[in-house]
Amino acid sequence: MIGTKSKFDTYPDGKIVVLGGSTVKEDVLLAIGKQLGIDKTRFEICLDYDALQKYNVRKMQYAPQYRVILCGPAPHSGQGKGDSSSIITELENSDAYPRVERLVAGNELKITKSNFRAKLQELVDEGYI
């Protein structure tokens, strides 16, 4: 699936947000980023499924310091989802958020080492991050 493009300008060296429940540890994701030449300070990561319900996505509205949001499995309810059916739907359908990319394994949202690496590599190759 092709990610949604940001409707406003974001900083090319902005934050890479990773949202979604995962068994892959944050340190592993940061190491993958480092292997691709991405500094760990660029990442903002929330991998705890329960913590995602309290994660306020609205802080990223029209915030150019956020470059891209990588989404794995997330609760349907959560802060900032507005009238949307889920947090991810809100992020994808609103012009107020930076570019959104889904991390998918098989036919389901899932954060794996391989799809995380592949998505980051795709964004690097594209010159987006």
Which residues make up each language-model segment?
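Short, aromatic/basic amphipathic alpha-helical patches
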Residues: 29-34, 81-93
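Structural motif
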Residues: 50-58, 110-117
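Alpha-helix C-terminal capping/helix-to-coil transition sites in glycosyltransferase folds
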Residues: 62-64
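Ser/Thr/Gly-rich flexible loops in soluble cytosolic domains mediating phosphotransfer, phosphorylation
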Residues: 86-129
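N-terminal targeting/trafficking signals and adjacent low-complexity tails
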Residues: 2-6
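Short acidic, S/G/P-rich loop/turn micro-motifs used as interaction or catalytic elements
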Residues: 22-26, 50-52, 72-79, 107-110
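Redox- and metal-dependent alpha/beta enzyme cores, enriched for Fe-S-associated oxidoreductases
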Residues: 7-57
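Extended, charge-rich low-complexity interaction segments
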Residues: 66-88
